[in-house]
Structure formats: C-alpha cells, structure tokens
C-alpha cells in the first residue's frame, strides 16, 4: 500500500519522476513504472489503497487517462493535491481543489514550493522517515555542508576590499559580507565591484545584517534602512534580515518578531531573505529555541535559519546538544530545514556542530588566525612561521610562495583559504557517505571513545 499516488499525463513524466524521487525519501510513492498484469485493475487498486493523491495539472491534464484517475480518486474519497505546472485551466471538473503552484519550481527539493507540497502531504499522511539531509541548496548552487568565508572590518587582518580581492583571486566558493562595511567603509564602491566580479565568476554571496559590527562598536544608529540601501545596491544571492537583538521571552511574540523582520526586509530584494533567531540567554530561552526554529520554518520555509553559535550555550558540549535538540524538533517536519550557525569558523567546532545537525557556518578565522593543517588548530596570525612548511602543497600556494609582491599577511590568508577549501570538500565527501564521526575524529585527532564521552548523544 503506497502513501502517495501520482497522477500525470505522459507529457509530464519527467516532472512526475522527479517528484516521485524526492517524495520517496519520506513516503512510499506509487507511479506506473512497474505495473504487472491488467493496467486498469492495477491503477484502480493502487488509487483505492493510497492515502493521498498528487495530480499534475497542465495543458495535457484534460486527457481521459488523467481525468479518469482523478474520478477514481474522488470516488474513493482520497485527498487530492494538484500541482499547477502551467497557466492552463485545470481539468474539468477538478478546478475546485486547493493546489500548489509549481509553475516556477526550478526542480530543487529545498525550494519553498516543494516544501509546501511536502507539508500538505504531511497533513494527510505522516512521513515514514525523518527528512534526509540535503547535499545542496539554492537550487544546487551551494553544496552542503558549507563554511562561508566571512568579510568584516572588525578585528581582522585585512581591509574588507582587500579581503574580497583575496577571496576572488582564490575563487572561494561562498562568502558572507557585512552590510555594515558596505555602508561605512571608505572603499565601499570598490567592495561592490569586487563582489560583482566574484559573482560573475560563479561565487555565492550572502549579505549579513551588519548587526555584529554595530553591536561590537556600540553603534546605536545602525538601522534596517542601512540594510535596505545595501540590498538595493549590492549584488547578492542570499541576505540575512536585520535581526532583533532583544527578543521577547514570549514564544508567540518571539516568532512574530522574526517573521516580521524577514517580511520587512524581503521587500528590498528578489533574493531569498533569511531569518536570524536570537534568544534570551537563560535556561528558559534555550528550552524555547527548538520550538521557535520549527515555528519559523513552518511559516517562512526559508533555505536556512540562522542562530548565533554563542547563544547556544556556555561550552561546545552544550552547544552541540542544543543543535541536536533543534534538529530533532525540525525532523518532525515533512521537509528538511537547513540550519546556519553564525560566527562558527573553528574547524573543531564545525566538525562537532555539523554532526549535531547544523548545515552551514561562517567565520572570520581565515583572516584572523593561522591554521596548522596537521593539527587543524588555530594559532595567532604571526605564528604561521611555526608550520608554514606544513602547508598544503597546491599549485596556488606554489605561485603565492614564489610571488614576492604578496606579503606575509597575504601568504597566511591564501594558506588558510586553501585549508578551508579542502576542509569543505572533505566534509561534504564524508557526509555524503554518512561518515560524520569519522570526519570529526580526523579533524580533532581524538579517539572514538573520547569523542563519544565528550559529546553524548551526538556521536553514537
């Protein structure tokens, strides 16, 4: 007995197959691939036994084969969820059903359109398994898990425009840029030019709200209008909303504050606007957090939901446990919701928090510290001399070492970027095969028994 039966015209078979493949991660799905015996009998029995019907509506859906199956679905009182594939009228007389607009669906499982379908099916029949971790998001443009290389003027070794230049030259896959610097930097025009060139070369740009810098500098004049200006004048793929740094301690109000912030800032960009959640820094705040994240996911269905790592608990063990609690709550949804941790660039932290259930991270570590690739530990920037001989042997680093015009800071930065590029690649490769613990063991150098003792419930 299948959970979901898909009705479609043969002209829409490619879409039907993709929908079937994606839904099969959480439900049993019937498609007419493997009919044995009488075709009509098999269809009638399968519709009768199915718990939910998904029907593809297009200009081809008025064919008798489609309307006949719709008639059977109504006869057996099945819940029918139409997917509108084009601008044609629904097949008569089945235009009264609540539908999902698939006309602009790009074919990605993490798209809000497909998540709405998953949510509707979940109201009829519960998923058989928790949603599968995504291998990519943003329509495949951003592989997961992922560490964004951040750019900021606050306590880093580089002016933002120089940092952007290094990231462009390195061809780093994804970056996070603070809106604060895109307003206050004297080089903001050059920054925008660097960002445009970076995107033209295939890079992925995430704009941050700028509240991190404003908070650190005690700048009370930083307002949503500043972010609006940045969104209107800076090329980007995603943007974080102007987050509310003083959240309510009431559940409903806290959720509403985040949703309103996203809706306000989304008016100024065609790119996805992403929520940032802050919580009261107490036991009650941490206890509410998983439910708040889930509620915001259900209302907005954003590509990612961001939470500052520093607000997840006092130590890494507590933070990992909080992430796991959030993931457990999100796993009750019929679709996968990705989590972003703000300010997480330490390799050891990433290895543990990704295993706990986080998907994307960002950090300034690449332009603040020097990474020892053998221990995967961070050191003072000037301590690069202790392990520069251990650097990754890559063509880029050979060029960097040979170029006398690249100063000490530049050599450290490119060394770090090469490290994080390989870190990202290896993390994705091992996560694709479920080797989350093996990845953490490799990064930290700990033994399995030590890792499990330190982080109970994360590594089993």
Indicate residue ranges for each PLM-predicted region.
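Short loop/helix-cap segments at secondary-structure boundaries that form the rim of catalytic
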Residues: 88-97, 353
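Conserved N-terminal substructure of TIR/SEFIR domains
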Residues: 1-56, 74-78, 84-88, 92, ...
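Glycine-rich phosphate/ribose-binding loops and adjacent secondary-structure elements
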Residues: 271-399
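C-terminal extensions of enzymes
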Residues: 127-155, 159-161, 393-460
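Non-catalytic, usually N-terminal nucleic-acid engagement modules in DNA/RNA processing proteins
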Residues: 127-270, 428
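Conserved acidic residues
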Residues: 51, 173, 237, 303, ...
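Short beta-alpha junction loops
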Residues: 59-60, 84-89, 209-213, 244-246, ...
């Amino acid at each position: 007995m299948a959970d979901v039966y898909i009705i479609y015209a043969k002209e829409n078979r490619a879409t039907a197959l993709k929908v079937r493949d994606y839904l099969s991660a959480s439900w049993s799905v019937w498609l007419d691939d493997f009919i044995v015996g009488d075709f009509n009998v098999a269809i009638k029995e399968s519709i009768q036994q199915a718990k939910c019907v998904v029907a593809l509506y297009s200009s081809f859906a008025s064919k008798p084969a489609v309307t006949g199956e719709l008639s059977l679905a109504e006869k057996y009182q099945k819940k029918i969820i139409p997917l509108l594939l084009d601008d044609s009228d629904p097949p008569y007389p089945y235009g009264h059903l609540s539908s999902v607009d698939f006309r602009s669906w790009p074919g990605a499982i993490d798209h809000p359109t497909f998540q709405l379908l998953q949510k509707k099916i979940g109201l009829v029949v519960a998923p058989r398994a928790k949603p599968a971790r995504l291998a990519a998001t943003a329509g495949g443009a951003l592989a997961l898990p992922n560490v964004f290389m951040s750019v900021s003027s606050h306590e880093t070794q580089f002016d933002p425009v120089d940092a952007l230049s290094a990231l462009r030259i390195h061809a780093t896959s994804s970056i996070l840029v603070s809106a604060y610097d895109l307003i206050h930097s004297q080089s903001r025009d050059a920054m925008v030019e660097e960002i445009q060139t970076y995107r033209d070369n295939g890079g992925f740009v995430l704009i941050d709200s700028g509240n991190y810098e404003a908070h650190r500098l005690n700048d009370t004049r930083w307002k949503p209008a500043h972010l609006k200006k940045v969104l209107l004048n800076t090329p980007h793929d995603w943007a974080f909303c102007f987050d509310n740094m003083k959240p309510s301690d009431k559940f409903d109000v806290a959720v509403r504050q985040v949703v309103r912030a996203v809706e306000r800032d989304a008016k100024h960009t065609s790119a996805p606007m992403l929520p940032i959640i802050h919580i009261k820094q107490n036991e009650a705040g941490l206890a509410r957090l998983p439910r708040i994240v889930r509620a915001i996911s259900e209302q907005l269905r954003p590509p990612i939901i961001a939470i500052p790592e520093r607000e997840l608990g006092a130590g890494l063990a507590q933070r990992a446990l909080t992430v796991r609690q959030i993931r457990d709550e999100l796993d009750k949804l019929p679709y996968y919701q990705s989590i972003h941790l703000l300010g997480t660039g330490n390799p050891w932290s990433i290895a543990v928090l990704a295993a706990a259930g986080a998907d994307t991270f960002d950090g300034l570590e690449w332009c603040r510290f020097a990474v020892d690739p053998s221990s995967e530990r961070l050191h003072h920037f000037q301590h690069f001399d202790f392990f520069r001989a251990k650097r990754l042997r890559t063509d880029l680093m050979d060029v960097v070492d040979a170029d006398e015009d690249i100063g000490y800071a530049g050599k450290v930065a490119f060394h770090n970027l090469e490290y994080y590029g390989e870190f990202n690649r290896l993390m994705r490769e091992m996560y694709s095969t479920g080797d989350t613990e093996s990845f953490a063991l490799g990064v930290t150098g700990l033994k399995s028994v030590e890792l499990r003792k330190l982080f109970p419930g994360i590594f089993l």
